[in-house]
Swiss-Prot record:
UniProt keyword terms in alphabetical order: ATP-binding, Nucleotide-binding
GO molecular function, one term: ATP hydrolysis activity
Amino-acid positions noted as binding ATP in the UniProt annotation, renumbered to this chain: G31, P32, T33, G34, S35, G36, K37, T38
Protein's name in the database: Uncharacterized protein SAOUHSC_01413
Family statement: Belongs to the CbbQ/NirQ/NorQ/GpvN family.
The organism's place on the tree of life at top rank: Bacteria
CDD domains, per database record: AAA
Miscellaneous section: Disruption of this gene leads to an increase in hla (alpha-hemolysin) transcription and proteases production.
InterPro entries registered for this protein in UniProt: ATPase_dyneun-rel_AAA, CbbQ/NirQ/NorQ/GpvN, CbbQ_C, ClpA/B, P-loop_NTPase
Length: 263
């Protein structure tokens, strides 16, 4: 099945990402949570017909999660031997694929320097577990994503950031958002879609003012909401997809107020 492509009224977002990819530059997608950064990376992967290996960063990310690990395997002769299982970084390098590092600023700063040689002109790494020197084959590219100011994120190391070219990815809106809702959700009623878009605009404004978290205004939450509206009242759908995810009562009340204004 064909991938539902990333869309943005600002065509330079995708066009510049594609141009950087063609130049084999490391791309850092920077923007609010749920703005479509992963969708943009997936679309690039499909457009250039190159598979993508994904790393999801967290404070628990370690070198083994990136590069791979040793394990015991029984060979064809029935004997046990120690083998190395390639992780996403080494797989992408050996196969000439895309490496996508999601939420790179969630990782502990001391975990990522192992990638320095991968991200600069050398495009190579010495596997600390085997001693093997791996040089990336043609086609290998790196895309990373960052949610600045999100809970749990850390300032990105300058030496690491300098290895990337940055593209800002903001939320989509207007007719583009309307088309995305129709293509990627079950909701098709134009009047309801217009109401939802206006409601989402209010959430985005509140998010920028710090009244609610970014996730409440994300495209992911919006598409879930549109699906639920087709099977339940809009107020209950908003409660299930947005309000009940929030812990702060003030954030919840702010969204209840927006519901009263829009529906």
């Amino acid at each position: 099945m064909a991938l539902k492509h990333y869309k943005n009224s600002d065509s330079t977002v995708f066009n510049d990402a594609k141009a950087l990819f063609d130049l084999n530059k490391n791309i850092l997608l920077k923007g609010p949570t749920g703005s479509g950064k992963t969708k943009l990376a997936e679309t690039l992967s499909e457009v250039v017909d190159t598979p993508m290996h994904q790393v999801n960063c967290s404070v628990d990310l370690d070198t083994e999660s990136l590069l791979g690990f040793k394990t015991i395997k029984t060979n064809a002769e029935g004997q046990q031997e120690i083998v190395f299982v390639d992780g996403p970084v080494i797989k992408a390098m050996k196969e000439g694929h895309i490496l996508y590092i999601d939420e790179i600023n969630m990782a502990k700063p001391e975990t990522l320097p192992v990638l320095n040689g991968v991200l600069d002109y050398r495009r190579q790494i010495t596997n600390p577990y085997t001693g093997e020197v791996i040089k990336a084959v043609p086609g290998f590219n790196v895309i990373a994503a960052i949610n600045e100011g999100y809970v749990g994120t850390l300032p990105m190391n300058e030496a690491l950031k300098n290895r990337f070219v940055v593209i800002h990815v903001d939320y989509i809106d207007g007719d583009i958002l309307k088309n995305v809702i129709k293509e990627q959700s079950l909701l098709q009623d134009d009047k309801q879609i217009e109401q939802i878009i206006k409601f989402n605009e209010d959430l985005r404004t509140m998010s920028k003012q710090g009244q609610i978290s970014e996730e409440a205004a994300s495209i992911r939450a919006l598409l879930d909401l549109c699906d639920l509206i087709t099977v339940m009242p809009v107020e209950r759908a908003i409660k299930r997809t947005i309000i009940d995810k929030l812990e702060d009562e003030r954030e919840q009340q702010a969204i209840y107020n927006a519901v009263e204004l829009n529906f």
